[in-house]
């Protein structure tokens, strides 16, 4: 019988030659191992396919064509976003299925790295060149192993080329602690020894390595602490402070943006909508897109019906007020809540909210003469006395309807993007790629005014939305670069590691979190003001939605200062795919995943977003009851007002299982290698045999 080998030893490795920068990595010339390592450029060509890790969709922070392709899943699984189209978070509703193959259990990149390492001493390279390529290889192997141990825990550590006769191909999983130490050692070697040999623009260098090291040291250090692993978590966190400080010294300023509208938090928003990130402050490494060479659909999706990312009420509530206070703080000045519309919810909030979620507005479609002040090519502002869908607009309503258009900048042309006349970054009102107007925000899926730019909760995700890019709504034509490593993450890594080591004070807050707040236009964090009552909604270890089948880990009272540090991370990195990594390393998955999602507060009879003609006809739910009891007792369509119902409580399906902290080892791999053990809980969950 033909022997089938585990992926560890037979993972396909195509030998390819590629161009010199991290733009596109398509093969140009086929090589064989016999002729692949004759000169320096051969090593470069052989390693270039490893850059595909940064677009690999099993990594939730990867950049792959659109938000919905990878980052959405990190935020969705992590409980910060929901799916518009009746798709439930599988970790919340226990719809995870047994994994037969795949699931990220893949060692093909590791095999490629090991093949290259085996040829470093063939005589084609100088000592310095060999150290450089060893460093590049160590970086890529460490980066992939970072994901493997985050996903599976113990995994086989493979540091040489294997074949079907190699006993290591059928060996056991290496303990997580050993793999973690090896990852750190490889990244530290790479940071110290990677050279400057002009491998091309935007390729792996010492600072890229340090950024990965900062990420891993925080991730693994906190995982070890909160999961009770026998790992030197304090050593990891101290190293995180050191390497993060080196990067903070190298990147002392943040990107402030270039849009003429000069919105608050412009630099924060434009990190995801700028045509070229080359040389931009704080950008360590990025995915480059170029017209007619390599393009994406990030912005494209957020103009059309295909954008299925929704934001629930509890995530909107996470964002601070502009004065730096949580909305539950009695001094916050929060104007939202029961009986309040979206303008009240958004009033005086952290401007990063407006860069992630489209603010509310109402305009009237228009055709005819224009003055480009109040009346534009395809729309006009509503004035007091105007008739809007059978409703006579009041003066207060007219002012409210236009407030965020003035704030974000008016979409004056409402034409097709690029050479067709689109201009600027985020603008209101919205439009699709056929220059069709979205006259109201939110454009609720139930009773929507137009069939695109719709949302179920009322909170429309538009992090990558801009007006200057061109698309057709069906193909990849967008060219805004996207960050992979940036100093903002490093600042947050430093702040969190400092708190875990009991070093967090006002000086640390000022050089990390308050730098981010200065750019966003949010009041500083004052550490001395953060006490037990600073945020009444803080996770104190007694959240009612913690009940269910999960709960072995994480039912602890989160320190008030740590709560604010974590909040800042979730706000600053929202929409980037970090959530599922973070809630698992904090051992807080049940807290974030088990919450029943819902949308904004509205009414059935006088819907402000689409008066009279398109009043909301969907179901309601009591969000206050959810916050009190963990779930709503009923979805009530007769009350006539309430928060928009989206999904039932995850607790009705059992909620988060602690089994999910690690992924299932694929059954096909265990069939090939009898020494591979299964992660805890999966045998019982799926009735698997040994």
Predicted regions and their residues:
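Long, intrinsically disordered, low-complexity segments
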Residues: 18-19, 106-109, 182, 264-332, ...
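Conserved, well-structured interaction surfaces
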Residues: 39-60, 80-152, 168-181, 185-201, ...
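Structural register within alpha-helical repeat arrays
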Residues: 134, 141, 213, 220, ...
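Short coil/turn linking the two alpha-helices of tandem helical-hairpin repeats
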Residues: 147-156, 198, 216-228, 500-503
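C-terminal substrate/ligand-recognition segments
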Residues: 351-517
């Amino acid at each position: 019988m033909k022997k089938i080998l585990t992926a560890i030893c037979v993972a396909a490795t195509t030998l390819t030659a590629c161009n010199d920068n991290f733009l596109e990595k398509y093969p140009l010339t086929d090589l064989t191992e016999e002729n692949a390592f004759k000169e320096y450029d051969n090593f470069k060509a052989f390693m270039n396919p490893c850059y595909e890790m940064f677009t690999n969709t099993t990594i939730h922070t990867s950049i792959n064509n659109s938000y919905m392709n990878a980052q959405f899943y990190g935020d969705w699984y992590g409980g910060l976003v929901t799916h518009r189209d009746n798709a439930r978070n599988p970790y919340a509703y226990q719809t995870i299925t047994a994994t037969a193959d795949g699931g990220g259990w893949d060692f093909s990149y590791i095999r490629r790295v090991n093949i290259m390492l085996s040829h470093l001493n063939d005589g084609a390279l100088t000592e310095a060149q060999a150290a450089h390529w060893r460093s590049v290889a160590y970086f890529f192997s460490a980066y992939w192993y970072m994901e493997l141990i985050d996903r599976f825990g113990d995994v086989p550590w493979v540091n040489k080329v294997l074949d079907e006769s190699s006993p290591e191909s059928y060996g056991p999983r290496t303990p997580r602690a050993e793999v973690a130490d090896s990852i750190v050692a490889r990244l530290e070697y790479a940071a110290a020894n990677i050279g400057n040999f002009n491998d091309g623009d935007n390729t792996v260098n010492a600072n890229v390595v340090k950024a990965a090291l900062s990420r891993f040291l925080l991730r693994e250090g906190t995982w070890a602490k909160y999961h009770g692993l026998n790992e030197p978590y304090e050593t990891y966190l101290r190293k995180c402070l050191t390497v993060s400080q080196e990067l903070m010294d190298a990147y002392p300023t943040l990107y402030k943006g270039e849009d003429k509208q000069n919105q608050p938090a412009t630099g924060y928003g434009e990190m995801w909508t700028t045509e070229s990130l080359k040389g931009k402050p704080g950008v360590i490494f990025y995915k480059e897109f170029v017209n007619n060479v390599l393009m994406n659909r990030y912005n494209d999706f957020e103009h059309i019906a295909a954008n299925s990312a929704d934001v629930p009420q509890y995530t909107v509530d996470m964002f601070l007020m502009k004065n730096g206070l949580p909305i539950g703080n009695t001094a916050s000045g929060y104007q939202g809540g029961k009986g309040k519309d979206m303008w009240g919810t958004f009033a005086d909030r952290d401007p990063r909210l407006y860069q992630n979620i489209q603010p509310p507005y109402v305009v009237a479609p228009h055709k005819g003469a224009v003055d480009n002040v109040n009346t534009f090519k395809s729309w006009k502002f509503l004035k007091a006395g105007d008739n809007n869908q059978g409703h006579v607009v009041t003066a207060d309503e007219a002012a409210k309807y236009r407030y965020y258009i003035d704030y974000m900048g008016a979409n004056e042309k409402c034409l097709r993007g690029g050479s067709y006349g689109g201009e600027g970054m985020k603008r209101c009102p919205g439009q699709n790629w056929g220059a069709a107007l979205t006259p109201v925000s939110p454009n609720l899926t139930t009773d929507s005014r137009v069939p695109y730019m719709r949302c179920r909760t009322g909170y429309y995700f538009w992090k990558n939305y801009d007006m200057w890019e061109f698309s057709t709504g069906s193909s990849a034509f967008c060219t805004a670069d996207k960050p992979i490593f940036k100093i903002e993450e490093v600042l947050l890594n430093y702040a969190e590691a400092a708190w875990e080591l009991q070093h967090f004070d006002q000086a640390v807050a000022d050089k990390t979190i308050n730098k981010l707040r200065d750019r966003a236009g949010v009041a500083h964090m004052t550490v001395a003001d953060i006490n037990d009552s600073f945020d009444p909604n803080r996770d104190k270890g007694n959240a009612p939605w913690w009940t269910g089948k999960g709960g072995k880990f994480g039912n602890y009272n989160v320190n008030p200062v740590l709560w604010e540090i974590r909040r800042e991370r979730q706000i600053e990195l929202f929409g980037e795919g970090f959530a599922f990594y973070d809630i698992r390393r904090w051992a807080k998955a049940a807290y974030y995943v088990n919450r029943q999602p819902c949308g904004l507060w509205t009414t059935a009879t006088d819907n402000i977003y689409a008066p009279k003609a398109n009043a909301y006809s969907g179901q309601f739910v009591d969000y206050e009851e959810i916050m009190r009891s963990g779930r709503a007792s009923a979805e009530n369509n007769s009350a006539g007002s309430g928060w928009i119902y989206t999904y039932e409580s995850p607790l009705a399906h059992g909620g988060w299982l602690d089994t999910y902290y690690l992924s299932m080892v694929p059954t096909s791999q265990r069939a090939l290698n009898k020494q591979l053990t299964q992660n805890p809980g999966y045998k019982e969950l799926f009735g698997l045999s040994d």
